[in-house]
Amino acid sequence: MKGLISGIKRMEIHDGDGIRTTVFFKGCPLKCIWCHNPESISFEKQAAFYEAKCIKCGICNGIRNELTAGNCPVDAIVFYGKEYDVDTLVDEIMQDEPFFRNSGGGVTLSGGECLAQPGFAVEVAKAFFDKGISVYIDTCGYIRQDVLQK
């Protein structure tokens, strides 16, 4: 099973107890004007251009996509949306396990709306739970009742 992730933020202290790694899922059914993560609203992969950061170096030649995002020296082009399978995502985040164990932290699933990808989110949460890692779910609550029960 695969899911689309907007980003992973390590060493978070505002998304739950202890030191946490927050996984931002791509996609949200709502379009709130006060959204803190508007890059995660779309269910599609997307490039973003931050003009204020651009130093006009010409490396991108004005092309803003997944290929040029990694080459921008000042991160004026950022690509949001990477496909992960459950094991790859869990393995990447388990690098932070010593921080979780020593601080009482864990993993926070956020977004977008993490439960808009219900099968993937549940499998990821179960994988961490099976490893004894605390999992918090940051949700807007705009989801089916049966998903909440899982």
Can you say where each PLM-predicted feature lies in the sequence?
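Conserved Radical SAM active-site core
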Residues: 42-149
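Iron-sulfur (Fe-S) cluster-binding modules
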Residues: 1
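N-terminal pre-triad scaffold of radical SAM enzymes
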Residues: 5-59
